Amino acid sequence: MTSLREFRKLCCDIYHASGYKEKSKLIRDFITDRDDTDTYLIIKLLLPGLDDRMYNMNDKQIIKLYSIIFKQSQEDMLQDLGYGYIGDTIRTFFKENTEIRPRDKSILTLEEVDSFLTTLSSVTKESHQIKLLTDIASVCTCNDLKCVVMLIDKDLKIKAGPRYVLNAISPHAYDVFRKSNNLKEIIENAAKQNLDSISISVMTPINPMLAESCDSVNKAFKKFPSGMFAEVKYDGERVQVHKKNNEFAFFSRNMKPVLSHKVDYLKEYIPKAFKKATSIVLDSEIVLVDEHNVPLPFGSLGIHKKKEYKNSNMCLFVFDCLYFDGFDMTDIPLYERRSFLKDVMVEIPNRIVFSELTNISNESQLTDVLDDALTRKLEGLVLKDINGVYEPGKRRWLKIKRDYLNEGSMADSADLVVLGAYYGKGGKGGIMAVFLMGCYDDESGKWKTVTKCSGHDDNTLRVLQDQLTMVKINKDPKKIPEWLVVNKIYIPDFVVDDPKQSQIWEISGAEFTSSKSHTANGISIRFPRFTRIREDKTWKESTHLNDLVNLTKSLNSYI
């Protein structure tokens, strides 16, 4: 039986190992000669992000509960959290507290920790959570509790993802897992050297196949020289549909259950669309459409948002069949899967329909199809190798959208001013890593917020710490300067000393969008990304609020 202390040491060794091979070897050596039950537990806890158990608490909630347990200042603990990881903060205050004395020696087994996590996932009341967290702390050393909290937080900070961990079991375990998503089955079959026998398991989610961005038509043909399908990119929600007899399961892009109000209607229509299917797995997109089957905007699937579209209903656009009545179809070419889908599915107008697909043979044809999609206010196209197999979790497709054209610079970018900053988390804890971007409102003479922006590399962040002149306000509403109009949810840790002397950044994104939380007339940017610093501009030449309003109007008239 593996002890928590042994597991902690393994995590420490993995963290300090230099590369993929060394990390995997450490895990392989550790699990050698252990039985399947023990190996399964070790691998499962090394991958807390894949664990289905939900603990109903984020970092701030964990801080709140342990501030009560330790009788420590919640504000002090939150401030400490701003400089690093949740595990380090809890360990620090556990060591200092006088309510529960940390154990001198580690006594917990991994099985006991796993049992605790299962129990914790079953409670939702704060009083019950406090009791469980108190009980586990009473049998922990400081380092034990740090590890337990990081398991609750679903991030051990060992710099080793699923590929590193699973391939320690067998060289192809990771690829097999992306298809089956059944860790226990992989461990049992790896011991028998029988991984090839593992297939899709109906009612268990499969890692969806993904797409990478493509910024030109020419690049698409270099990627798929033997031909491609161009499929409309629907602005809805990816849904993986599983049917087994009269049971149904619906999983999102991240393999979590889809909210019932979005998919319950499908239980009536899927048996009608697939009359011969006993068990089936479909890859699809659920979209709200109007009475003419025209897709409505992203985000309209929400209960409250849907009420704005009275004559609408949810429609499933099916683009792939991965499994049908005992037959795993992921290893056959796409054109065959699509042909099979046409044979077994009957469309139900406005409820279950085929995705719009075009067989592309030349660049001119692809350009025409893309122009048509954008003219119809659709998001773009997904391009797929006509002979491609379905590779779970891999980015083998291409997505080509309005904002990816022109070498990646999009039409709807804005030159925004850095107004503030937030502490980063994890490895970026203690430094400014996320930035509040905004624009000047000539009418009020105030600065308004548009979006938050992150994604800088470590070197850039290091330079920005010195380049940006900031004043620390610690999210205190009383310290917001008069020149800044910001809603409570976006009050930063720092504000710039003078916005008129601050940096101007070109910010691009998927599209301008509406946000009640931002103060620039509710205008924001969906999926914002930093493009470059506009050193050639002063604040006067930056995008002002009236420019932003005009820009969104002109873009909306085009798209």
Curated annotation (Swiss-Prot):
The active site is at K233. Mg(2+) 2 binds at E379. Its EC number is 6.5.1.1. It is found in: Host cytoplasm. ATP binds at E231, R238, E285, K384, K399. CDD domains: OBF_DNA_ligase_III. GO terms for molecular function: ATP binding; DNA binding; DNA ligase (ATP) activity; metal ion binding. Mg(2+) 1 binds at E285. One of its GO terms (cellular component) is host cell cytoplasm. Keywords: ATP-binding, Cell cycle, Cell division, DNA damage, DNA recombination, DNA repair, DNA replication, Early protein, Host cytoplasm, Ligase, Magnesium, Metal-binding, Nucleotide-binding. Its cofactor is Mg(2+). Induction: Expressed in the early phase of the viral replicative cycle. It catalyses: ATP + (deoxyribonucleotide)n-3'-hydroxyl + 5'-phospho-(deoxyribonucleotide)m = (deoxyribonucleotide)n+m + AMP + diphosphate. One of its GO terms (biological process) is lagging strand elongation. The keyword Methyltransferase does not apply. Interacts with host TOP2A and TOP2B. Belongs to the ATP-dependent DNA ligase family. DNA ligase that seals nicks in double-stranded DNA during DNA replication, DNA recombination and DNA repair. Recruits cellular topoisomerase II to sites of viral replication and assembly. This is DNA ligase. The lineage of its organism: Viruses, Varidnaviria, Bamfordvirae, Nucleocytoviricota, Pokkesviricetes.
